[in-house]
Amino acid sequence: MAARVLVIGNGGREHTLAWKLAQSTHVKQVLVTPGNAGTACSEKISNTDISISDHTALAQFCKDEKIEFVVVGPEAPLAAGIVGNLNSVGVRCFGPTAQAAQLESSKRFAKEFMDRHGISTARWRAFTKPKEACDFIMSADFPALVVKASGLAAGKGVIVAKSKEEACEAVREIMQGKAFGEAGETVVIEELLEGEEVSCLCFTDGRTVAPMPPAQDHKRLLEGDEGPNTGGMGAYCPAPQVSKDLLLKIKNNILQRTVDGMQEEGMPYTGVLYAGIMLTKNGPKVLEFNCRFGDPECQVILPLLKSDLYEVIQSILDGLLCTSLPVWLDNCAAVTVVMASKGYPGDYTKGVEITGFPEAQALGLEVFQAGTALKDGKVVTNGGRVLTVTAIRENLISALEEARKGLAAIKFEGAVYRKDIGFRAIAFLQQPRGLTYKESGVDIAAGNMLVQKIKPLAKATSRPGCDVDLGGFAGLFDLKAAGFTDPLLACGTDGVGTKLKIAQQCSKHDTIGQDLVAMCVNDILAQGAEPLFFLDYFSCGKLDLRTTEAVITGIAKACKKAGCALLGGETAEMPDMYPPGEYDLAGFAVGAMERDQKLPQLERITEGDAVIGIASSGLHSNGFSLVRKIVAKSSLEYSSPAPGGCGDQTLGDLLLTPTKIYSRSLLPVLRSGRVKAVAHITGGGLLENIPRVLPQKLGVNLDAQTWRVPRIFSWLQQEGHLSEEEMARTFNCGIGAALVVSEDLVKQTLQDIEQHQEEACVIGRVVACPKGSPRVKVEHLIETMQINGSVLENGTLRNHFSVQPKKARVAVLISGTGSNLQALIDSTREPSSLAHIVIVISNKAAVAGLDKAEKAGIPTRVINHKLYKNRAAFDTAIDEVLEEFSTDIVCLAGFMRILSGPFVRKWNGKMLNIHPSLLPSFKGSNAHEQVLDAGVTVTGCTVHFVAEDVDAGQIILQEAVPVKRGDTVETLSERVKLAEHKIFPSALQLVASGAVRLGENGRICWVTED
């Protein structure tokens, strides 16, 4: 027992954390700052007085006091970057970084994040102007009655209005009346969801998620959920409304998906993740995220933790949660009831004596103090929510009864509390439980009706070898009756991917079946196989007969086109697996070819063979995750007219153009023996599919100018700013299949293909491919798309399409106000900027520059140089943060430290500084004084690359500034700053774009376009 732990906060949550940590045999002492009367003087728990806003001083305190780790209770320090700042100087801190804590500190960020990662939440919009917010409230096609301040508002920034007018009034109070200060500069307007609200928390080390038992809070002040909103008047755990299956679903679809998404976006999330969830009739939906334990949820969850909390936190900090998953008490329930001061949540009195603690403890109850203080040796009230009484018993009803006894024992004048905590759970447990299979979500009668509807559709696909009759346990196929003598079988399975999402959003289900069949039969065609029969798998949460019939009708029609029988399938109705209106598809095709007709014939393929491209009908069924993201960022909806040149249809209809089925048209060509290989251009595009049918030492060179690239690809390239490689690796770019034939057989092969009404042309040649070289090279792809996407303007073609370069990731180092920081922030927010500020680092805490960055939503770190023994150690700490944020360019904006040689050499050509004179004149820290002393009439500023010698780096840009009669250092400095604000962003843009770089000879190199 040697460890000392620091808990930050002063509420009931922090008292509970300290109480649980003190139970560990590893812990010698738990310090709490600022703490309350409950944490002031027990055997292992005591308060300490150290500022939590001065992270530098706090870090030094932790080092001096040999603190093993810090546990942060409330949200504000997390949002202020306490975790990153302490970790950066070697003090372990439990909780998410400021960047990860945006899930709570910015509701707008959280909602956008959930949309990006497919996490179910209420429909919403964010606004910075009250009128626009109110217009949306009045016109939304859903009840837009939930108004949230986007920033932190101490748990009070959510207003649930009863009418549109009340919602608009809430907007005005928040945005114009500044009810929540800066937190309300942006408001989020949300759909009002119906259902029960539960709290689902988990521990996570950034990868593993360990759910806690679900809890339910009671926000309203009075019994029956009446009265004003509060921070919480009580809670119970576990919430029986959340079954084990539902909790697993919440873990997988919400908690794990959130943690994985933060990892993918470069913001690993560690600590406690709290999801406030509404249990709607359409499944669980996230109301909000918190980045710490809830209060009072903490007071009912941690008492049920069987594991050592100290060990759990250590495993999370070590990234080893998977090896030490927490264990919870079985067959127990916990209830906590809050006792509040008279007048809460409005004005309340302080200093009222509290009695009865020994009596409550004698009942076996835990009393966790919150708004309390010690005065003359007595415990007195010191806040709105004063304390919580927690009971742990074998069931919820018993726990509530015991908690009520504690409420009777503890007394203070004007105490307010609820006696009905857990009433929803009790009502739930008392409900009758007789259910039918249909009530559980599976309608057998509807399934049988569907089978009867699709039987004739399947029957119509019968062919030699197979007489389809649905309803048996399996289907049969007679190869001999189909005319085969020495056959090989080929099989393939596939799905449609997220093209389904567009079909479901557009309510267009009649063509998606052809996509499914085509993806499977085209795959086996690449083996030379004739498709014989097909089986489908259709799964949904709730069977909709009209939708399902439309999909399977499309499958049956596609099977007829392909010449294969729809031999059978499976329709699975699985409640809770899919949201209403959603379904998934999978297909399975079996085909055959005579043994001597198997493809590819690798031994026949030689250098110089021709590659014939078969036109696609459009996107086919690949790349739709990218397509959907591009459409979401564009100005178009799926219901919008298609882009110019793409036909008279909606964008949704265009994207849903079904995949071509090539089996009937290409089989005669393949059986001629002239074709050596066929590649189906599916997932992986041109670059990854053609090599699958080539010998290892061969590749192909393709020329995009030889085939017609449909306009939709040009539009996607423009809107997504996609590179040539991204296009060729994701999409078919107009080629649905590629055939390899000898050069002397090209003419006859093309004639045969065209006889079957397929568009075909020679698109390239087979070439030798040295080891390590790309197997597929596509020339002129972007140029062809640019011509497609050009418009005639003043008699010349104007190009609308360009590949958007990747934005450079920029770190800014400051020591104070960050004199040029705001100019850099403003410029990098312009759409044309090629730079993006990802981190602001200061060597001093609580400076104005950090406020500017945090207001702009930019992560910050404080790395105090005084805590390091030398410059090299300090620079190493900075470098670690730069690497953590994958920094490309470093800007020094009023950074008053001389950097070490190794650091400067590492960032040579990637680090910019600005000096307030026209270098090489007037170097050093007092440039303005030198200018005035010299009596010159012109000075200025210089942006330069940083070199080891101070102010000696290569010059990027300069701006002249006049020295006026009567100038002082102050007036001249202000004039020069205006020029700095102009040229520093310009120089950053030049370096980020690659127009300026530092050459290998150490000289400036300007890159010009011909």
Swiss-Prot record:
Official protein name in the record: Trifunctional purine biosynthetic protein adenosine-3
SMART domains xrefs: GARS_A (SM01209), GARS_C (SM01210)
PROSITE patterns attached to this UniProt entry: ATP_GRASP, GARS, GART
EC assignment: 6.3.4.13, 6.3.3.1, 2.1.2.2
Pfam families: AIRS, AIRS_C, Formyl_trans_N, GARS_A, GARS_C, GARS_N
Site (Raises pKa of active site His): residue numbering on this chain: D951
Protein family (similarity comment): In the N-terminal section; belongs to the GARS family.
Stretches for region GART domain: 810-1010
Domain ATP-grasp: 111-318
Organism this protein belongs to: Bos taurus
Pathway note: Purine metabolism; IMP biosynthesis via de novo pathway; 5-amino-1-(5-phospho-D-ribosyl)imidazole from N(2)-formyl-N(1)-(5-phospho-D-ribosyl)glycinamide: step 2/2; Purine metabolism; IMP biosynthesis via de novo pathway; N(1)-(5-phospho-D-ribosyl)glycinamide from 5-phospho-alpha-D-ribose 1-diphosphate: step 2/2; Purine metabolism; IMP biosynthesis via de novo pathway; N(2)-formyl-N(1)-(5-phospho-D-ribosyl)glycinamide from N(1)-(5-phospho-D-ribosyl)glycinamide (10-formyl THF route): step 1/1
